[in-house]
Swiss-Prot record:
HAMAP family: Archease_arch (MF_01222). InterPro entries: Archease, Archease_arc, Archease_dom, Archease_dom_sf. Activates the tRNA-splicing ligase complex by facilitating the enzymatic turnover of catalytic subunit RtcB. Acts by promoting the guanylylation of RtcB, a key intermediate step in tRNA ligation. Can also alter the NTP specificity of RtcB such that ATP, dGTP or ITP is used efficiently. Belongs to the archease family. It holds the Pfam family Archease. Gene3D superfamilies: Archease domain. This is Protein archease.
């Protein structure tokens, strides 16, 4: 089961995602990112985009994945309310394939909150917790 939460971080807000798998934690942190911007519960899966990134480590993979989603938001005005992720180990690191579904931002419907300017490595962590769940977190630049 994936879930996310926002946490206090000095003048910013952190995004932390949990999942029973690494993929679910990445999905949850992506949804948490968009929930900083809008009410994701009101986003319908009208349009889908596929994202594919490859990186040497999990932190770089998370960064690149979230950056691709933010670029889609900035370029096409999309907000996402559903994300499915597949991660595979490769010879050189990791490969992520994702399908993100949502719709064009409608201020009356989606209740805009904060504007995320950029993805950062600030306070980024990805770890398997003692209870077996995965956690991924970072602090976006608002």
């Amino acid at each position: 089961m994936r879930k996310w939460e926002h946490y206090e971080h000095t003048a910013d807000i952190g995004v932390r995602g949990y999942g029973s798998t690494l993929e679910e934690a990445f999905e949850a942190v992506a949804l948490g990112l968009f929930d900083v911007m809008v009410n994701v519960k009101k986003v319908e899966p009208k349009e889908c985009r596929e994202v594919e990134v490859e990186e040497e480590d999990l932190e770089a993979l998370l960064y690149s994945f979230l950056e691709e989603l933010l670029v889609l938001h900035d370029m096409e005005g999309l907000v996402f309310g559903d994300v499915k992720v597949r991660i595979e180990k490769t010879e050189n690191g990791y490969k992520l394939k994702a399908k993100a579904c949502g719709e064009v931002l409608n201020p009356e419907k989606h209740e805009p909150k904060e504007e995320v300017k950029a993805i950062t490595y600030h306070d980024m962590k990805i770890e398997k917790l003692p209870d077996g769940r995965w956690m991924a977190q970072f602090v976006p630049d608002l």
